[in-house]
């Protein structure tokens, strides 16, 4: 099973964060009241969702490596995985949302959908194909119950 990309999702997230900071000066911005608090909230929420979901993988003694989904040994469906099939990527998106709010939000309207599209096409869909091969009907039922993002 080959993924459509060889760039780990945390690296993709960092690249998008750099683009948000770099391009934020070239786009109009909205100065929200309390933007520092709102942005910190989303950044911390993103870290919490990402790392608590990764901890679920460790508790189940299965791989957290997004580049090797075929090494997954257990289907994780508890914690944040009850509400989204991809809480770690959702956490990364929340982190980028926090950065976008801090940088005036408008630039995020461009980069956040690009991040979702990129991660979905190059990472999530190949991971789902690997999970279908490994877990079959169990993963199919999980896909019917729980949405890809939220």
Please report, for each region that a protein language model flagged, where it lies by residue:
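Membrane-anchoring alpha-helices and their flanking helix-loop junctions
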Residues: 1-78, 90-150
């Amino acid at each position: 099973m080959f993924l459509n990309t060889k760039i780990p999702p945390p690296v993709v997230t960092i690249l998008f964060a750099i683009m948000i900071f770099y391009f934020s000066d070239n786009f109009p911005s909205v100065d929200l009241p309390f933007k520092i608090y709102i942005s910190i909230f989303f950044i911390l929420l993103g870290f919490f969702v990402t790392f608590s979901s990764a901890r679920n993988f460790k508790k189940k003694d299965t791989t957290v490596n997004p580049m090797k989904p075929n090494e997954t040994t257990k289907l994780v469906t508890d914690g944040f995985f009850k509400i989204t099939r991809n809480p770690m990527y959702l956490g990364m998106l929340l982190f980028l949302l926090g950065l976008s709010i801090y940088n005036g939000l408008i630039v995020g309207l461009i980069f956040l959908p690009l991040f979702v599209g990129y991660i979905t096409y190059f990472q999530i869909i190949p991971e789902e194909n690997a999970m279908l091969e490994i877990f079959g009907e169990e993963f199919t039922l999980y896909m019917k119950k729980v949405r890809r993002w939220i």
